[in-house]
Design a protein with these regions (language model features):
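Solvent-exposed soluble domains appended to multi-pass membrane proteins
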Residues: 1-331
């Protein structure tokens, strides 16, 4: 319904909650990908979930922060469910944004919020705003850390595969393991811009990445930048050849079964899952099956006001307008 959806699909809290019924049916170990949409342009105002008030004079920026807060809350609920359902400790979580958050046309309005001077905002600052969150959470691995390695989404696959103990030497991969000492730390954008830990290259202009100051074109700088450009151009050329020539159709390593796209349709996915479960029989390793048919869905707790049984108290004195769980009315 319109109440439960935003521009591109279900609101995050409802999406995660409704996904639990499918997640518990997946044979373990499984790979599951969730694409959330609440924290996505145009960040529409949602009075039912307005838990973070900001007034910058730009509704898009205000909405960005409010929906980011909402997305955080949705993830917290999902993580709690994973713990309560007994899936958390044996799961590797990978969270990332697929592109920048706010259009560069609004960056000068955003600048004061991140401690920057809008009058001094320039191309380097725009480039830095292309960064996206990337989090790997491995329960039980000890104290976490923040890595200052430079990388892109192309590096996610080799990084995760190595964390899972997969030998990738037989595979063709364009990315690099972000945790490897041999990682070159180069990020190449489709428009030819390049970011490394040392230099940010935007057209013919070169900045020091750590300070944002212009890099003087000394012989050493020119030589290093030329080497970086050569690496970047090679990456883009290979990407173009693979994409434009559809070269993946020739890539069939040992043990790889090409995907038959005709067999995949989101509309009949639940029915196909049911068929797969029936075929497994006693070999089923899903959470639902190993729990002797007891569903974990009731363990999922959400304060989403749209969810049956939850209600928002419309009172200005209620902190942040937080939803309050109430019992469903008797029929």
């Amino acid at each position: 319904t319109d109440e439960n959806s935003v521009e591109y699909g279900l609101k995050d809290k409802l999406f995660f909650q409704e996904s639990a019924q499918y997640l518990e049916q997946l044979p373990q170990p499984f790979y599951a990908k969730f694409i959330t949409v609440s924290n996505h342009f145009p960040f529409p105002e949602d009075e039912m979930n307005n838990t973070f008030t900001l007034d910058t004079g730009d509704e898009t920026i205000d909405g960005y922060f409010n929906t980011a807060r909402y997305a955080d809350e949705a993830l917290a609920e999902f993580f709690q469910y994973m713990k309560d359902a007994g899936l958390y400790d044996n799961t590797l979580f990978v969270l990332y944004g697929d592109h920048f958050g706010i259009s560069s046309s609004r960056n000068e309005t955003l600048a004061p919020l991140i401690g920057a001077n809008p009058d001094l905002w320039g191309a380097y600052d725009d480039a830095m705003m292309q960064r996206v969150p990337f989090i790997i959470h491995n329960p039980g691995s000890g104290t976490g850390q923040i890595s200052d390695v430079y990388g892109g989404q192309i590096d996610i696959l080799p990084t995760v595969m190595h964390l899972l103990g997969v030998d990738t030497s037989a595979y063709v991969q364009l990315g690099q393991d972000l945790m490897s000492a041999q990682n070159e730390g180069i990020v190449v954008f489709r428009n030819g811009s390049i970011v490394t830990s040392e230099y940010t290259i935007l057209g013919n202009t070169v900045y020091h990445t750590q300070t944002g100051t212009l890099a003087y074109q000394t012989e050493e700088v020119v030589e290093k930048v030329a080497q970086i450009r050569a690496q970047a151009e090679l990456q883009l050329a290979i990407s173009d050849q693979i994409t434009n020539g559809d070269l993946l159709r020739f890539y069939t390593p040992d043990g790889f079964t090409p995907v038959d796209k005709s067999l995949h349709n989101y509309v009949d996915s639940p029915a196909r899952l049911a068929e797969d479960i029936a075929e497994l029989g006693n070999l089923n390793t899903s959470l639902y099956y190993t729990n002797n048919g007891v569903s974990s869905v009731p363990l999922y707790q959400t304060d989403a006001p749209e969810f049956p049984g939850n209600q928002v108290i419309a009172d200005e004195n209620v902190t942040h307008g937080q939803p309050v769980a109430v019992e469903a009315p008797a029929e």
